[in-house]
Amino acid sequence: ALPISKSNFMIPFKDITLADKDTITSFTMKSDRRNCDLSFSNLCSWRFLYDTQFAVVDNFLVFKFWAGEQLAYMMPVGTGDLKAVLWKLIEDARKENQHFCMLGVCSNMRADLEAILPEQFTFTEDRDYADYIYLRSDLSTLKGKKFQAKRNHINRFRNTYPDYEYTPITPDRIQECLDLEAEWCKEIGRA
C-alpha cells in the first residue's frame, strides 16, 4: 500500500481557459506523447463536462478531472522527478477523500509507473477509450481496402440524411449537443 504523507503542500490547480493555451502547449508540444487527451482543443472543449483543471508542479504539467463520481488524473507531462510529482498527485487525491486514479495511461506510461512505483498500481485496459491514429492524407481520400467500411458508413449517412448541414457549435447549442450525446448513450446502453 502507498504510505500516507503528512505534507501540507497543495497543488495550485486552476480551471483551463483560452488564456492558458501557451502554458499548456509549452509542455504538450515538447512531449513525445501524442494522444487526444493532451490536445488543447479537446481540453478546452471537454473542460465543462469533466471539470478539468491543471497546474504546473516541479516542471510538470498535471491535470485532474472528474470521470463521473471518480476523481482522476492524467500522467504528468514534463521533465524532472516524476516520482515526487506522482506522490503529490496521490496526496491530492487523499485530500479530496478519493482513491488515486489515473486515466489515459498508455503502455509506455505504464512501464514508467511500474519502474518508479513498482507493484503499487492496478492497470485496466478499456479499448473504448483508445486513440486511433491515421494519416491526414489517408482520411482525406479514404483510398484502399482498409477504408472500405468508412466509405460505406459515410455513404450510408449521406443517403439517410440527404439534407444534413454543417453548423458551428456555439454556446447556445451546447445543451443541444449534450442532449444528443445523452440520447446516443441511451441507444448504445451507456446511460
Where are these regions (language model features)?
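Conserved small/polar residues in nucleotide/adenosyl-binding loops
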Residues: 1-4, 191
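Short Lys/Arg-enriched alpha/beta "domain-start" segment
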Residues: 12-16, 20-31, 37
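Conserved donor-binding loop and adjoining core beta-sheet/short helix segment
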Residues: 26, 36-108, 113
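Structured helix-beta-strand junction loops
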Residues: 27-31, 96, 160
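A broadly conserved amphipathic alpha-helix scaffold signal in soluble, globular proteins
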Residues: 87, 91, 107-114, 155-162, ...
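Acyltransferase donor/substrate-recognition loop-hinge adjacent to the catalytic core
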Residues: 119-189
